[in-house]
Structure formats: C-alpha cells, structure tokens
Amino acid sequence: AHYPDEIVISKAIKRLYDWTELLKPSRKGIGKSKQMGLWGEMFVLHEYMSGVHPIKDAVNFWIGPDNKKQDFTLNHMALEVKTTMSGSAPAIKITSIEQLERITDRLYLIHIFMNKGNEPDALSLNDLYDQIIESINDDTETKTNFLFSVSKIYGKATDTERNEKFVFLNYNLYEVDENFPNILGGDLPDAI
C-alpha cells in the first residue's frame, strides 16, 4: 500500500513520541498487584501462548498492557489472566466489569497460583522478559512490538520488583459462559 508522505511522517512522529513517553525515567514502582499481574501475563505469554502459536502471533495477541478488556485476544476467543499468591483468599479480584464481558465467541479466565521463591525454577519479571526476548530471536518487528507493550508497565517497575522471584504452582482455567458467575454492565443501574 502507498501512503501519502504526510501520513507516514505523522505516524513516525507519533511512534517516536510514544517511545519518548515510555522511556522517560519514572521507575517509581508498580506495586504488588501490577507486579503479580504482569508476571502472570508474561508467564502465560512465554509458557502457554508461545508454545501453541508462533512467538510473533503470541506477542501480537497480548494486549494486557494496553488496558484492554482482556489480556489476550486471538481469532474468536479472549483470555483474561488473574494471578494470586498461594494461600490468598480463593476469590478472584476483577478490576473492571468489562473484564468478564464477552466480546468474542469464547472468553476464558486463567487463574495462576504462585509463591515467592528462590528455587531454580523461580522466575522474576527480568527472567521472563529475557526468556521472551530470547525466543523472539532476530525478529525486529516482533521484538519492537513486545518492547513497546511490556515497557508500559515493566518500564515503571523498580529493580526490586523486576528481580523478585516467584514459583509457578498451578492454574485453573474457566470458560466464561452464561453459567459463569458475573455481573454485566447492562445489568447495572445507570447510577452505579
């Protein structure tokens, strides 16, 4: 496709601006909840999505850092990732009502259980980041897409948050269908 020069320049300037915003040193920390959420999403990306799909597709399916309704969307399905420490309350915290609204034919919720650890199989955000970069190899476009997405949260994490190690314990996978307990936005009064 041929684009007018103004569009190409405009898109390039926007991309450069986005990168400068992301690369600003603002490593104030992301907090435990976002740290665990990012760990879970990166774990699913590396351990499950890239095991079933080419890494290029797996990275493109990952939209969690973009504050979309679900964390992964592909074809006619979506996947929401929730990560909790073992021993936490069994309830899964949903941060917005839209997270469990189906906009695809199928919606799944994967609940990852983890613990802090220092065993050989324990992984930090840095470890997952490095493993994903390594699996991308020399695909510059995929690497750029991954770096752009991950930097939205990872770029704000402190060194302590990036290096804290967790051990994957188990997961539960649920299909969010008409029998799944949830509240839909259309069910709520306008005042809420």
Which ranges hold each PLM region?
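Nucleic-acid endonuclease domains
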Residues: 1-67, 84-192
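Conserved catalytic cores of phosphodiester-cleaving nucleases, focusing on short active-site segments
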Residues: 48, 72-85
